[in-house]
Amino acid sequence: MSDIIKDTKSRMQKSIDNLSRELANISAGRANSNLLNGVTVDYYGAPTPVQQLASINVPEARLLVISPYDKSSVADIEKAIIAANLGVNPTSDGEVIRISVPALTEERRKELVKEVKKIGEDAKVSIRNIRRDINDQLKKDEKNGDITEDDLRSQTDDVQKATDNSIKEIDQLVADKEKDIMSV
């Protein structure tokens, strides 16, 4: 397998991994520590992820418990969660922060499904852009005499197969997440 095809698959896999991370951050009405993935706290002047400042537990299906290692950071963590606009209200007793994840309404579920589809579509566009870039590079290589016309055709077919597989994987990830969101 040529380096170009390996590069193509590697770049496409990165797009799929990015999609997986984005989908993991979308709450399906159940408490999940991934909900706090993008939340950073201003801790002694440095933006720090919540995961580095506290242990995060999920004792019940709709409850997140955040136990800061440094009790003086409770208020800062709480402010950061509120500022992150996650659609949840943290409550604190001075030692731990509890986040009760509300049940999703039918309307909110539909909004989330739309968001998931949009994120999936963006990932597909990313995959297609990778395909276009690689195909342009292959045509340039053929024009410069670096590869033969047969190699061009063969590698273009390989790029298309990689694209098709990646799009199929994206569709599956999106369908699984939609099913997860719509299940009550």
Curated annotation (Swiss-Prot):
Name of the protein in its database record: Ribosome-recycling factor
GO MF annotations in UniProt: ribosomal large subunit binding
Localization (cell): Cytoplasm
Family per record: Belongs to the RRF family.
Top-rank taxon, per record: Bacteria
Organism name: Staphylococcus epidermidis (strain ATCC 35984 / DSM 28319 / BCRC 17069 / CCUG 31568 / BM 3577 / RP62A)
InterPro entries, alphabetized: Ribosome_recyc_fac, Ribosome_recyc_fac_dom, RRF_sf
SUPFAM superfamilies membership: Ribosome recycling factor, RRF
CDD domains, A to Z: RRF
Stretches the record annotates as Disordered: 141-165
Keyword NAD in annotation: no
Cystines in this chain: none
Pfam family, one: RRF
Role according to the record: Responsible for the release of ribosomes from messenger RNA at the termination of protein biosynthesis. May increase the efficiency of translation by recycling ribosomes from one round of translation to another.
One record GO biological process: translational termination
GO cellular component entries: cytoplasm
Keywords, ordered alphabetically: Cytoplasm, Protein biosynthesis
PANTHER family, alphabetized: MITOCHONDRIAL RIBOSOME RECYCLING FACTOR PSEUDO 1, RIBOSOME RECYCLING FACTOR
